[in-house]
């Protein structure tokens, strides 16, 4: 159903996955660190791209494989205040990475190197087993058949700039498998946020921030904006819960999302 935020509107009526708290949490918390270029993998309705556009001055490319979702995404971009910094491309991320590698190689006539982004953001599909929805768009958005962890990490390795970072949100039960694959793609975890739905519950979601292995040896925070520094310090505690036991949003989540939600 359509969802109105403070500065933009999201129509997700044709998307396999509707606007969710997961997406809002990732979009609000991801350490953009003044990124000038951002890639949104599996953009859906464009929520993450729109949140990133509100938080930054970056040029943002959204990749969405589902035609109907890409139409919603384009419509939402066109209606936003940042339409001139947002683009959506309807294709899968593997095809996008391959095409940009070839174009760059032909233009520069040297070893392959992709167009790269300073930040990559993704709310990926994570169900590896179990029955799939009869709704093709929903199945694509939720199951790793459409984008495996290996394919996603290969794309991040190829498309992430040397000093850039990638932010992803996963269910806690999927994190161990995901993390075992990082070294294969010369990626390492630089930050992690554990998020619980309710105070006192175990974390059911985790935001992982990845960087190239070589980037971790020289990772000064000198250019990090003050607002982001505070978030990174909070992330070091590796905890955040969305709601208090009384059902109200927690102070931490309210602070993160108050620039977006109408009623905060």
Curated annotation (Swiss-Prot):
It holds the Pfam family Cons_hypoth95. Keywords: Cytoplasm, Methyltransferase, S-adenosyl-L-methionine, Transferase, tRNA processing. PROSITE patterns: N6_MTASE. GO terms for molecular function: nucleic acid binding; rRNA (adenine-N6,N6-)-dimethyltransferase activity; tRNA (adenine-N6)-methyltransferase activity. Disulfide bonds: none annotated. It is found in: Cytoplasm. HAMAP family: tRNA_methyltr_YfiC. This is tRNA1(Val) (adenine(37)-N6)-methyltransferase.
């Amino acid at each position: 159903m359509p969802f109105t935020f403070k500065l933009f509107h999201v129509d997700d009526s044709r998307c396999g996955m509707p606007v969710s708290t997961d997406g809002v949490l990732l979009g609000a918390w991801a350490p953009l660190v003044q990124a000038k270029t951002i890639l949104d993998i599996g953009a859906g309705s464009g929520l993450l791209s729109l949140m990133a556009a509100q938080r930054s001055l970056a040029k943002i490319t959204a990749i969405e494989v589902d035609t109907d979702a890409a139409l919603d995404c384009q419509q939402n971009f066109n209606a936003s205040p940042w339409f001139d910094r947002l683009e959506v491309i309807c294709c899968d991320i593997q095809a996008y990475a391959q095409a940009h590698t070839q174009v760059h190689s032909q233009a520069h006539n040297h070893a392959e190197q992709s167009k790269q982004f300073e930040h990559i953001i993704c709310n990926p599909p994570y169900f590896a087993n179990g029955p799939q929805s009869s709704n093709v768009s929903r199945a694509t958005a939720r199951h790793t058949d459409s984008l495996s962890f290996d394919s996603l990490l290969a794309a991040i390795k190829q498309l992430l700039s040397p000093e850039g970072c990638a932010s992803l949100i996963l269910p806690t039960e999927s994190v161990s498998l995901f993390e075992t694959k990082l070294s294969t793609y010369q990626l390492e975890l630089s930050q992690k946020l554990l998020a619980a739905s309710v105070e006192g519950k175990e974390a059911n979601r985790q935001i992982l921030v990845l960087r190239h292995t070589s980037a971790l040896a020289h990772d000064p925070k000198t250019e990090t904006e003050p607002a982001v520094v505070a978030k990174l310090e909070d992330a070091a505690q590796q905890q955040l819960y969305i709601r208090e036991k009384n059902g109200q949003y927690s102070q931490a989540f309210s602070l993160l999302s108050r620039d977006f939600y109408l009623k905060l």
